[in-house]
């Protein structure tokens, strides 16, 4: 049984309708819908959404994710870039999070599409956060995205080292994800960000080790949330346990002590949870800490 502290919250109904209409009108996908995020109506009720580019079919099959798996066979809808910008204009967004499915069928993993979106959004005055796949570990693809000028470069490690083969697609890797984050900083990303889930069988010590690994990769922002099974499919893992609010608070204390500039840790925290607030907190702490 899901405990009471893992409770879903509603948002402003009128804003929810406005977001849904804008997305439908412009044919834009969101990870909120595709990944069945538990915060969807709360975030939409605040007029925010995380846009998903490069279609809605992922070439990978991670066991925590509800996004559809398949082979897009190299298809890219370049009109998606302009439609996304129009949806952002219509919704009046100033902080935009852009993510994508994994596209192992593309030579650059979709990096050039990310870059095109970032440049367009910067032209209309948006602060942009990208949440990228691992691009097969390609430094060139990471550089393509970073060079386009995102304000935050995010890539999720998802889980601890030991559980990575169980939780993520076989083409993903713990060290590869750390490398992607390191490359981003080396290529000049102003802020980097990562996230992981609890409740998959990890120990407290393994969580701390993962946070230490992320800091060694010079990651600035981290999000920690509870894994919630997105469907009844046997492909999706069952939660081993539900971490308590006290455990999340303790882990946040550890993360802050390790030097992260901003930390979100709680049962319903997801990668893009309160993204703008975390961005501002990180900037403030960079200035404060010199």
UniProtKB/Swiss-Prot annotation:
[4Fe-4S] cluster 2 binds at residues 58, 62, 65. Its main location: cytoplasm. Pathway: Protein modification; protein lipoylation via endogenous pathway; protein N(6)-(lipoyl)lysine from octanoyl-[acyl-carrier-protein]: step 2/2. It holds the Pfam family Radical_SAM. It is found in: Cytoplasm. GO terms for cellular component: cytoplasm. SUPFAM superfamilies: Radical SAM enzymes. It comes from the Archaea. The keyword rRNA-binding does not apply. Binds 2 [4Fe-4S] clusters per subunit. One cluster is coordinated with 3 cysteines and an exchangeable S-adenosyl-L-methionine. It catalyses: [[Fe-S] cluster scaffold protein carrying a second [4Fe-4S](2+) cluster] + N(6)-octanoyl-L-lysyl-[protein] + 2 oxidized [2Fe-2S]-[ferredoxin] + 2 S-adenosyl-L-methionine + 4 H(+) = [[Fe-S] cluster scaffold protein] + N(6)-[(R)-dihydrolipoyl]-L-lysyl-[protein] + 4 Fe(3+) + 2 hydrogen sulfide + 2 5'-deoxyadenosine + 2 L-methionine + 2 reduced [2Fe-2S]-[ferredoxin]. Its cofactor is [4Fe-4S] cluster. Gene3D superfamilies: Aldolase class I. Its EC number is 2.8.1.8. SMART domains: Elp3. Residues 44-261 form the Radical SAM core domain. [4Fe-4S] cluster 1 binds at residues 32, 37, 43, 272. GO terms for molecular function: 4 iron, 4 sulfur cluster binding; lipoate synthase activity; metal ion binding. Keywords: 4Fe-4S, Cytoplasm, Iron, Iron-sulfur, Metal-binding, S-adenosyl-L-methionine, Transferase. Belongs to the radical SAM superfamily. Lipoyl synthase family. NCBIfam families: lipA (TIGR00510), PRK05481.1 (NF004019), PRK12928.1 (NF009544). This is Lipoyl synthase. The lineage of its organism: Archaea, Thermoproteota, Thermoprotei, Thermoproteales, Thermoproteaceae. The gene is lipA.
